[in-house]
């Protein structure tokens, strides 16, 4: 898919990388499946860059509009996961 990630131009390169890695993990949850621990770790790093719930929600909505992938739905599934790997159903 061709789309751009919702990034804040005020972030450092390292912060942008962390956000992109989290969004790529969301993509993997839909496309191939992902280890729940890995995704939780990516989310913790993401929250260091984006601590505000409002900004997290805005990024999630913008990402879903661009990609069709819901970070919110993935994280809800991870929160309640009983398996070591998750894969979202389209």
Curated annotation (Swiss-Prot):
Belongs to the UPF0223 family. It holds the Pfam family UPF0223. It comes from Listeria welshimeri serovar 6b (strain ATCC 35897 / DSM 20650 / CCUG 15529 / CIP 8149 / NCTC 11857 / SLCC 5334 / V8). It comes from the Bacteria. This is UPF0223 protein lwe1035. The lineage of its organism: Bacteria, Bacillati, Bacillota, Bacilli, Bacillales. InterPro entries: BH2638-like_sf, UPF0223.
């Amino acid at each position: 898919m061709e789309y751009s990630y919702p990034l804040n131009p005020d972030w450092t390169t390292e912060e942008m990388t962390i956000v992109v890695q989290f969004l790529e993990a969301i993509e993997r949850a839909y496309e191939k499946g992902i280890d729940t621990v890995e995704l939780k770790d990516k989310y913790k790093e993401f929250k260091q860059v984006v601590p505000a719930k409002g900004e997290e929600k805005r990024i999630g909505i913008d990402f879903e509009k661009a990609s069709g992938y819901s970070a919110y739905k993935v994280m809800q599934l991870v929160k309640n996961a009983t398996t070591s790997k998750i894969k979202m159903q389209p």
